[in-house]
């Protein structure tokens, strides 16, 4: 399962330990995956896969951060690891495997997404969007935060993020979208359906 900034893992079985294997990739620069209450730091080098194992013993939300200076947005490169019971985790996996739901009311927003630069970087399962540089947005609105943890995931913050990402996360590589208000409303409405 590919995620961005929010990782869901199952609770390890205390009788028969079941650690979780995590494959780590970086597309842009050196990073270091660090969630202090779960594991030590693991470095990421662009275009080289690295991996780690974690063996969580308690459910909850564990906070982490990139531990390698990686540019102007480094201080806002936050992450969350959700340790869930096996049943909760299995339900989350099932939901993540579903294609994005789109209805006619938001089809204009989907067209905007697929005809602007969004499609070059982002993936939305079940659509023609299969970019690999930015986060997979298939279930964007199931996340608590956007912009690597820089802002709560609300339609208002999403709108601000689309209009000018650098106001939310200085140094962001995402370009500002030059959309009129109607296009911005439609794109935000479309993204809000990706749950």
Range-by-range predicted roles:
Residues 1-117, 126-132, 149-156, 160-163, ...:
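Non-transmembrane, membrane-proximal soluble domains of secreted or membrane proteins
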Residues 37, 141-142:
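Short, histidine-centered active-site or binding-site loop motifs used for metal coordination
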Residues 94, 114-119, 123, 142, ...:
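Sec-exported extracytoplasmic/periplasmic mature domains
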